[in-house]
């Protein structure tokens, strides 16, 4: 009996998946999550502290302290008096590799398996720690070398550092007018919120004003009045039309 094209894709996916990881650096899923956490905190705010990491990772402060000691010893991090923890070149490369895997998997889940954009993050979180570089290279080729993930994030090429294309957040917008949503943070609750309000990548929005009293960003989206909190506005990246 012949397999359908969908079944063939799934068979190939899991056949390569079981080959496991091929890495020179001794990494664990937990350590990889810490690296991503430090990178993500660094893109949103100033000093990266043990307290911020513990809150973001939802772990105890002693657990963070222990992991930071290991990562400093392995030269994945350095500690700066003003900035807190900073990723070294090695740490940045490992983070870029993780985002490359994660985002390629997300594209695969949407394009080949029919997932919606708010469903893919958790699946990709699991798979990114398991797949080999051989798998990732094959996946990238099969997907015709996509440049962005379903959330608008840049997919770095092999051995290249992650450089996001869009950096202006909705929270930083001051001039009323029309904007395009270009990228959003890969956060489950945020993605569920955006899905609920039908806010999508490359969608045009009309920024009306920031209301100081309610502390909400007032938007018009296809004739719908939408109010966005500062926390959400900080995670939506836009481009002025």
PLM feature spans:
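Short acidic, hydrophobic short linear motifs in intrinsically disordered regions
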Residues: 44-52
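Mid-protein regulatory/catalytic core that forms ligand/cofactor-binding pockets
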Residues: 128-234
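Alpha-helical residues within the helix-turn-helix
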Residues: 55, 72-73
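Basic, amphipathic "hinge/linker" alpha-helix immediately C-terminal to the N-terminal HTH DNA-binding motif
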Residues: 83-102
